[in-house]
Design a protein with these regions (language model features):
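Short glycine/proline-enriched turns and hinge-like loops at secondary-structure junctions
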Residues: 61-63, 70-71, 114-117
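A short, N-terminal "cap"/entry segment at the start of jelly-roll beta-barrel domains
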Residues: 1-44, 89-95, 141
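Glycine- and acidic-residue-biased ligand/ion/polar-headgroup-sensing regions
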Residues: 64-84
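Conserved short histidine dyad/triad with adjacent acidic residue
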Residues: 48-64
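Short beta-strand His + acidic residue motifs that chelate non-heme Fe in jelly-roll/DSBH
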Residues: 59-60, 78-80, 101-104, 110-115, ...
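Short acidic-glycine-tyrosine-enriched beta hairpin
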Residues: 82-107
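Double-stranded beta-helix
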Residues: 2, 12, 20, 86-92, ...
Length: 142
C-alpha cells in the first residue's frame, strides 16, 4: 500500500491516475492503492484503487462496514452474491453512461472486476483495516 502525501491538498488528476495505473500494471496483483489515510488504523479509509483486467479480487464482505466505489476512469463490473454464491446483482459502472458508483451495504458478498485497462476507482470505507478471515472469502463457481 502507498500512503498519501500528507499535503494540505492533493489534486487527483491524470498524472496521479497514470502513475498509479503504471504501478498496477507492473504489480503481480494487477492493482495498486494510493491511500489518503495515513495508517490502517484510521477510522475512515479513502483511497484510489487502480485495477487492471485480470486482477484477482476475491468475493468478500465486510460484516460491520459499508463500502463505496466511484469510478474515475474506465469500466468496472460489480457483482454481489447471496451466501450460497448465487448472483444478486451484476452491473457495469461506466461514467460515460452515467453509472458512476455504488454503495455496498454491510455484510454483502461482493467483488469488482476491471473491464478496461487503466481503470481507477475511488473507494471509501470505515476503518480500521481488518484482514479477511477464512469465512470472509466466498468461493464461487464461475
Amino acid at each position: 500500500h502507498i500512503f498519501g502525501s500528507g499535503k494540505a491538498i492533493m489534486v487527483i488528476d491524470n498524472k496521479i491516475l497514470d502513475n498509479l495505473t503504471a504501478q498496477a500494471k507492473a504489480s503481480p496483483r494487477l492493482r495498486m492503492n494510493l491511500n489518503f489515510h495515513q495508517s490502517l488504523d484510521e477510522k475512515c479509509h479513502r483511497f484510489l484503487n487502480a485495477v487492471e483486467p485480470g486482477a484477482n479480487i476475491p468475493v468478500h464482505r465486510h460484516p460491520e462496514k459499508e463500502e463505496s466505489f466511484v469510478v474515475l476512469r474506465g469500466r468496472i463490473r460489480v457483482i454481489t452474491y447471496n451466501d450460497d454464491g448465487t448472483i444478486i446483482e451484476n452491473m457495469v459502472l461506466n461514467p460515460s453512461e452515467g453509472r458512476y458508483g455504488v454503495n455496498v451495504g454491510k455484510n454483502v458478498w461482493h467483488t469488482v472486476e476491471a473491464l478496461d485497462p487503466g481503470s481507477v476507482i475511488f473507494e471509501c470505507k470505515e476503518g480500521p483495516y481488518v484482514v479477511h478471515e477464512e469465512e470472509g472469502i466466498l468461493i464461487v463457481d464461475n
